[in-house]
């Protein structure tokens, strides 16, 4: 019975000390489960009875959509985002809203006004961010699957740290209507799951064109493909910036592809040093623009007075480099760099079907450890190129170091999501 499964998850959530959830309404989801059991039209849908957690920057009617910030602490969603409507239409149930870095501006899960999320795979370490609660909820078995958002690695980073699967679809594959945006030219919604097969199913359920999001695209259903004849690219610079212990685990993962019959191709990406400055300069400007609606008049509090330290830092830098006298010096140069980075990245796919490598260059730090902003940003160096270039990228578990999970990142060209998801599935089967 679906209601029994919902009750079991609600009990687990209640007992959990991971701090994965911000808002759970047991009475509401149990009532919806009872109605679902009587709904014969949804019984053959791919997500029928699946219990899904949703990141707290995606609108779900009747739930607190706070972005883990005191700015929106009292805001309750008045509508369902397009992805949530799609989930419900496929027979899924929303169990609650997950914790996250405030306004999705972080890589650790520690900037939430509700306190940090713990990593179920290594309880003394960060789970990664910004989709920290969604990743932790899946890793701790507090739901069947979860939805997160990825602006510069916010699905893939916590998936890697928590030892689960995460997928960032190509830009435009999934509608962002109902998402509280961080940086609109980078943002994408995607799945966090216990296995790669579920990531394929969940991506198919939420993707598709939406009149409410002009960037959204229609794509055919993603199917599993044979990858045995694929060329797998390994980028030297991605490996070089990664800690040796993580690199060793990734090299074992690359051998798995070789054993499957894939050809390994050595590649070089000369713009790796531009990744973080390009990403963050554009991010700051777009985030500053996005937060102007949080003025304390229509809803919530005035953001500059209510937000935390990291969000305020991003707003102030974004304001500064948006000014006319600095825009040409910083923002416009970042846009030029983005164009060069994208051209170079897309060129790599002329030599390889997919690019495989590490997700994050270092192990997650311990909860509460003093880490500088620059050290925090360094977690993103291998994930932001995906968002800068609009390509797709997934993460699957690839070993561990003293019990701390390591994630293998698989990147594909724009709209080659099917290839990436297929490779994730085959890797899991053969690892």
UniProtKB/Swiss-Prot annotation:
Its EC number is 6.3.5.7. InterPro entries: Amidase (IPR000120), Amidase_CS (IPR020556), Amidase_dom (IPR023631), AS_sf (IPR036928), GatA (IPR004412). Pfam families: Amidase (PF01425). GO terms for biological process: translation. The active site is at 55 (charge relay system), 130 (charge relay system), 154 (acyl-ester intermediate). Gene3D superfamilies: Amidase signature (AS) domain. PROSITE patterns: AMIDASES. Keywords: ATP-binding, Ligase, Nucleotide-binding, Protein biosynthesis. Allows the formation of correctly charged Gln-tRNA(Gln) through the transamidation of misacylated Glu-tRNA(Gln) in organisms which lack glutaminyl-tRNA synthetase. The reaction takes place in the presence of glutamine and ATP through an activated gamma-phospho-Glu-tRNA(Gln). Belongs to the amidase family. GatA subfamily. Heterotrimer of A, B and C subunits. This is Glutamyl-tRNA(Gln) amidotransferase subunit A. The lineage of its organism: Archaea, Methanobacteriati, Methanobacteriota, Methanomada group, Methanococci.
